C-alpha cells in the first residue's frame, strides 16, 4: 500500500511541484541519487527527436528548431540567470511574469526553483553543500544527475523572499510542467 501511495505522490508531483514538499529538511536528508521516474521522462523527451526518422523533416521545422533554440537559451541566460538569480536589471511586474513564462518554456523548471538553486550554488560553490559542483561530484552529476535527484526537487521559498512574494511566479514555479506541455502541444498542432 505504501508503494502505491509513493507512486501516486510521484505522479501528482509531475504536475504540482510543491505537493508534499512541506518538509524541506526531509528532502535535504535524502540520498543524492537519480530518481528513475524523472529520468524516464527526460530520456523519453530526448528519444522523441528520433521521430524525425519516421515523419521526415522540412526547412520550416529546421529553422523553427534553430530559432527556438536561441530564443530559449536567451531566456535561460538572460532571464532565469541574470534577472531571477542575480537581479542584474529591473523590470515591471507584468514583464517579470512574461520573462518567467518565457523561461518556463525551456523545461528547466520554474524561475523560483532556478533562482533558489543558483543562489544556493553561489553561496556554497564547490563545497559539499553545492548541488551541482563538478569538483565535488564530477561532470555527469554536475550537468545532469543533480536535476533528476529527489533531494534537489523542492524549492526553498524562504531563501528567495524577493521572488516568492509574487503569487503569479509561485504558480508558474509550482506547476512548472504546464507551460512546456502547452508550448509543445502548440508546436505540434501548428505542424
Regions found by a protein language model. Give the residues of each.
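Non-catalytic, topology-defining segments of multipass membrane proteins
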Residues: 1-191
